[in-house]
């Protein structure tokens, strides 16, 4: 999460740029605004999910499984699809099974493998949640035209391509 509520002013950014060699005020302002907005969106998203008794991880599992609700899947496939470790996935699955939102069974030919399926209760929860979710996303993006939304996606894809520069050791 990014908790900086009081962002620097234009003059403060300019002052920082004079003090620090690689500080580009425009880039930093854009990145700080993106971090703050993304953090605020995630906070709102988590509050909405909490009303349905879900965390982001549990929601993502249900959403991915809902793409093909009649097709069983495995914990390892789900872990890859939502970007968590298998250990994290085990905890998320245990909670969803306990709440009756998914079922866990054994693979027909390989008893070592687990098969996971959405239950009727899980489908029912999604039927209640998803219209609310879609409506909130529509309102979130309501200030943009469809063309602006497409431009935003294109710009965010460009920013996403630069994420490795946050973690590499050299400053190329």
Where are these regions (language model features)?
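C-terminal regulatory/oligomerization modules of transcriptional regulators
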Residues: 1-22, 147-172
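N-terminal leader segment of winged-helix/HTH proteins
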Residues: 1-52
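N-terminal helix-turn-helix DNA-binding core of bacterial DNA-binding proteins
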Residues: 25, 39, 43-85
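Pre-recognition alpha-helix immediately N-terminal to the DNA-recognition helix
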Residues: 33, 60-64, 124, 151
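Short, locally clustered residues in the helix-turn-helix/winged-helix DNA-binding domain
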Residues: 35, 63-70, 130, 157
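Short, hydrophobic-biased segments on the C-terminal half of alpha helices
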Residues: 75, 93-94
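Charged, amphipathic alpha-helical coiled-coil/dimerization segments
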Residues: 94-151
